[in-house]
From Swiss-Prot:
Family membership: Belongs to the CSN3 family.
Any one Gene Ontology BP term: in utero embryonic development
Region described as Disordered: 402-423
Subcellular location: Cytoplasm; Nucleus
Classification via PANTHER family: 26S PROTEASOME NON-ATPASE REGULATORY SUBUNIT 3/COP9 SIGNALOSOME COMPLEX SUBUNIT 3 (PTHR10758), COP9 SIGNALOSOME COMPLEX SUBUNIT 3 (PTHR10758:SF1)
Stored Gene3D superfamilies: 1.25.40.570
Disruption phenotype: Embryos arrest after 5.5 dpc and resorb by 8.5 dpc mainly due to increased cell death.
Protein name, entry field: COP9 signalosome complex subunit 3
Keywords for the protein's UniProt record, in alphabetical order: Acetylation, Cytoplasm, Nucleus, Phosphoprotein, Signalosome
Function statement: Component of the COP9 signalosome complex (CSN), a complex involved in various cellular and developmental processes. The CSN complex is an essential regulator of the ubiquitin (Ubl) conjugation pathway by mediating the deneddylation of the cullin subunits of SCF-type E3 ligase complexes, leading to decrease the Ubl ligase activity of SCF-type complexes such as SCF, CSA or DDB2. The complex is also involved in phosphorylation of p53/TP53, c-jun/JUN, IkappaBalpha/NFKBIA, ITPK1 and IRF8/ICSBP, possibly via its association with CK2 and PKD kinases.
Amino acid sequence: MASALEQFVNSVRQLSAQGQMTQLCELINKSGELLAKNLSHLDTVLGALDVQEHSLGVLAVLFVKFSMPSVPDFETLFSQVQLFISTCNGEHIRYATDTFAGLCHQLTNALVERKQPLRGIGILKQAIDKMQMNTNQLTSVHADLCQLCLLAKCFKPALPYLDVDMMDICKENGAYDAKHFLCYYYYGGMIYTGLKNFERALYFYEQAITTPAMAVSHIMLESYKKYILVSLILLGKVQQLPKYTSQIVGRFIKPLSNAYHELAQVYSTNNPSELRNLVSKHSETFTRDNNMGLVKQCLSSLYKKNIQRLTKTFLTLSLQDMASRVQLSGPQEAEKYVLHMIEDGEIFASINQKDGMVSFHDNPEKYNNPAMLHNIDQEMLKCIELDERLKAMDQEITVNPQFVQKSMGSQEDDSGNKPSSYS
């Protein structure tokens, strides 16, 4: 092994033993070029370091190995990274979260290129757990995990990292990019859409769209298109975006989504035949955007919406009559829709098979059972927790030096602008 590499190994051992992690981070940041020049010796360096005791040194070597234009032996490197992420020291890693996250991004890209996304899911879950200070902290690796789960069509492993509300972002020594934030909410929205959890999907797309921005992001544009479609499926109309949404959404993103706005406009007429014509007219756009499946669900949701409207007018109705009023192909299709809607709790009805009549009923829920009271208690606890968190954030801002300086400056401006009472 070259003497410079020996010195690197000795320094890593010494600084790790002394617990001087900040100096060790400085060393590994400076050593990238040295390690890159000695690629053939890097496995020897790995052999001289202990993954648990010298985690930052091993991280530096693996990062450089993965950074090379071509990886000569991917399987060996994959095994080394897998072993490292599962056994490394989490406390040490948190000093170099930028490099650790970078290694995870490299692994993700390599698996995506090789069309092997499933292999990385378990590894990235371990990586997130090592990086996070708490379960409500968002890291850039969350987006990688969601991407692999989407490509592998294996959604459930991502849910524990999506079902929690994020309160904090891991700064990753300044390396955290807005792209990772947008991708987490965009991919998360797609996962929830695939699982038909449309309420949560809508929230995730909204987070991506309302991210403060000065320029158009392609991720925001695609989120906006899906936001319109999911909004129609879930609510029967496009939910208005919050007032704090960036102006670029109205100025640039909306004009780039004309086909989707037309779809929403026609949807509001409650006319399925017109909606089918519009879908046919813009089918190329919807297919190119990979949104045709959602568009078809919009058409299906319009039939359901029209059936729900019938429940407000009729107590009983024949399946044949329902099919003609809702523009379905016949009583069989009407029966299929009604049964699905009863199963999903969207309507309360029963079908008499003898005469093909549908009887609509009132909602049997009286909101007085223990389960409902428990739900109300849980929602109240969430509100109390949110109130406490807002108070803590308010206090944090109040004592922030930048905020104090700015508020004092504005007060001085105000007092300077006031006319003197003696003039």
